Regions:
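Short, solvent-exposed loop/turn segments at the edges of extracellular beta-sandwich modules
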Residues: 517-520, 652-658
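Extracellular low-complexity, O-glycosylation-prone stalks/linkers
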Residues: 606-625
């Protein structure tokens, strides 16, 4: 959100007065917990994930403006975020806007997009309102997944026509690319190899002038006009016994619609909008927003990329894991496989000030059965686990975060080239912070921290501080990095601070807490950071000592002294890199009066264990630790009738240092 601090403050003030957001997880206070939504500073929706050839996942989103126009969707551009670990997301900013299509498109209608990679180029398909008042799908092309994207056609790829929205593209193994779209009907075109055209002369296999259509509107089936909800027969789906063969076929493909509107059938099928088409292990999937309003995510499967489809069921329900609504009456999903896991992206209205017209992207892990069907997944506030640790010993952009409290980001152009841009954190004020998850300091640890910053404070004077904390906002402090003034926000400077190498080892969540003059709106800007790893001792080459020639000594026994040989010099050995222990399982947890007793499942390789406990489920504050060699531990002096969160990790010893494994599952315990 642009000026999000002011927006959040006004939202919180209003919500307190109206009694809204009860129990919500709010960005603007200490209760902020969720990793879902994955972006916290702007409203994002309609996620379109892409696994790129560079090894990263890119997620393209539409962008809900902070202020709506006519109390409706206000959307003018598309954002992009990337990750290699699924928990820390790098913000690439706006990668395309409706202005690129202003020859034929109108503003305030940058709906759900999708980007695909082919032959070294990236093709972004976007739906926009056309100047004639209907909708159309355009395409923009780039040499980079983050743009700049340009319109090669100067006109729509398909349309304009009513309800031409929500494009989804898949390139099949045989090289044929398919474009699906539509609300509430579903359409398909076969894209040519250039990805910016389709064969308009195709008139077979259900295609007419290059487009195939699935009739899914109520007025597509005349018999539905005479069906009412008398006896609840629409709501329970039993009316499907009295429909035509054509309607029955549509319902077999996309489910029996059970929405009622003025006592009539609102939709003959469950399909509503937002198709996501892909192939996997010989199966083809159509995932879509269904059964609105509020919408959930359903799917159908086929053995062919062109159907016929078979309705399979629900992936995401209408409500969150806690039974409460998502805060958004729409939903829109994207599905990928990445590094041995499968994920579904979707959106909610869970950010402060959020709702149906101000949405936020989230992600969950999903699983498939042997027959290819998908298991229903919960929508959670916790999100997903990291698939790998983040390397802190290379440059990390400051806008790469898992969670940010009150931080903003901005574009910074290099010289006059508006296509050559960077991004940085801005509007940093006292008490703001960012969280970077699963930072892997390795067994050897960090000895220094460097940051690139700018400020309007006089050069050399203190502009603020970056406190580095482990595992919580108030966790163990690695260092207090003093941000020096650079004289101007346009002038950048870097410095280093030393770190105790014994502290920064293993894998941790890293919190960067920003401190400074509480009355100043912007302390400094922050571009990137990097740790320095402890240098391993060099292994010296043994240098033999010179061997003196033995001199015979005459003795009464007339014996000669032996020749002396040089002894080899001992080699200095670097600490051996050891394997971190496995995750710890809590085999028994018992709550007592003001205490919790834990029994940890023993790990043979472990030298001991570290137990972390807190009243904050994401361990962002008030975290306490117990290090022990025992696998049965009692945590005492706890507040009675208070809920605590407990987790444990094992460690092994390596050259006098503890090397920790990852934490096991967090357990929620209410003390008696």
């Amino acid at each position: 959100m642009k000026n999000s601090k002011k927006v959040i403050a006004s939202v919180l003030s209003l919500s307190m007065g109206l009694g809204l957001f009860a129990g919500a997880s709010l960005i603007g206070n200490k209760k902020a917990e969720a990793v879902n939504p994955i972006v916290q500073d702007v409203y994002t929706a309609d996620p379109a994930p892409m696994v790129c050839s560079d090894g990263k996942v890119y997620v393209y989103t539409s962008h809900d403006e902070d202020v709506t126009v006519n109390n409706f969707f206000s959307m003018n551009d598309w954002k992009c975020y990337s990750t290699t670990d699924m928990v820390n997301w790098t913000d690439h900013g706006t990668v395309l806007s409706w202005h690129e299509f202003d020859k034929w498109a109108k503003d305030n209608s940058s709906w759900a997009c999708q980007c695909v990679e082919r032959n070294g180029k990236f093709y972004m398909y976007v739906p926009i309102n056309a100047k004639n008042g209907t909708t159309a799908i355009g395409v923009a092309v780039s040499d980079s997944p983050t743009g700049p994207f340009t319109d090669p056609l100067g006109e729509p790829l398909v349309g304009p026509a009513p309800n031409y929205i929500d494009p989804t593209v898949w390139v099949d193994k045989d090289g044929q690319a398919y474009l699906y779209w539509g609300n509430p009907d579903l359409y398909c075109a076969k894209l040519n190899e250039d990805m910016i055209s389709y064969d308009k002369d195709l008139n077979e296999d259900g295609f007419v002038k290059g487009i195939k259509r699935w009739d899914l509107e109520t007025n597509d089936f005349k018999e539905l006009a005479g069906i009412t909800n008398e006896g609840g027969r629409i709501a329970d789906g039993s009316y499907a016994d009295d429909v035509s063969d054509a309607c029955r076929q549509a319902q077999s493909e996309f489910g029996v619609g059970v929405r009622v509107d003025n006592n009539k059938v609102r939709r003959p099928t469950l399909y509503e909008e937002g198709p996501w088409f892909y192939g996997r292990n010989g199966h083809y999937y159509m995932v879509y927003a269904a059964n609105g309003i509020p919408e959930r995510i359903d799917y159908s499967m086929s053995d062919s990329p062109l159907g016929p489809w078979e309705y399979k069921g629900i992936i995401l329900e209408e409500n969150m894991e806690d039974g409460k609504g998502t805060g958004s009456f729409t939903n829109h999903a994207g599905v990928i496989d990445y590094k041995g896991h499968s994920y579904i992206f979707y959106h909610t209205g869970k950010l402060p000030g959020g709702g149906g017209y101000k949405r936020s992207v989230a992600v969950e892990e999903i699983t498939y059965n042997e027959d290819g069907t998908i298991n229903t997944a919960p929508m959670t506030a916790d999100g997903v686990e990291a698939v790998e640790g983040l390397n802190p010993y290379q440059r990390v952009e400051a806008e790469t975060i898992a969670y940010g409290k009150d931080v903003e980001k901005e574009d910074r152009y290099k010289g006059d080239d508006t296509n050559n841009q960077d991004r940085n954190l801005c509007d940093i004020s006292n008490g703001d912070y960012i969280q970077i998850k699963n930072v892997d300091f390795t067994n050897y640890g960090a000895v220094a921290f460097e940051a690139m910053t700018s400020s309007d404070v006089t050069k050399g004077e203190t502009a603020g501080h970056i406190e580095l904390h482990l595992d919580a906002v108030d966790g163990e402090m690695l260092a207090d990095y003093v941000v020096k003034g650079s004289g101007s926000f346009d002038t950048w400077t870097s410095d280093k601070v030393d770190i105790d190498k014994s502290k920064a080892t293993g894998e941790h969540d890293l919190f960067m807490v920003f401190k400074g003059d509480a009355d100043k709106e912007e302390l400094f800007k922050f571009d990137y950071w990097q740790f320095t790893q402890m240098e391993l001792p060099a292994t010296p080459t043994p240098t033999p000592t010179s061997v003196p020639t033995a001199t015979p000594v005459v003795t009464p026994a007339a014996t000669s002294a032996p020749v002396q040989t040089a002894a080899a010099s001992p080699q200095a050995k670097a600490p051996a890199k050891v394997k971190a222990p496995a995750k710890v399982k809590l085999s028994k947890v018992k709550a007592g009066k003001g205490k919790i007793t834990l029994k940890l499942k023993k790990i043979k390789s472990a030298a001991g264990y570290r137990i972390a406990y807190s009243t904050n489920k994401n361990f962002r504050k008030a975290v306490k630790m117990i290090v022990t060699k025992k696998n049965t531990v009692t945590i005492k002096k706890l507040k009675r009738r208070k809920t605590y969160y407990v987790r444990a990790q094992a460690y092994v010893n390596n050259s006098g240092r503890k090397v920790y494994g990852n934490y096991g599952t967090t357990v929620k315990v209410k003390v008696r």
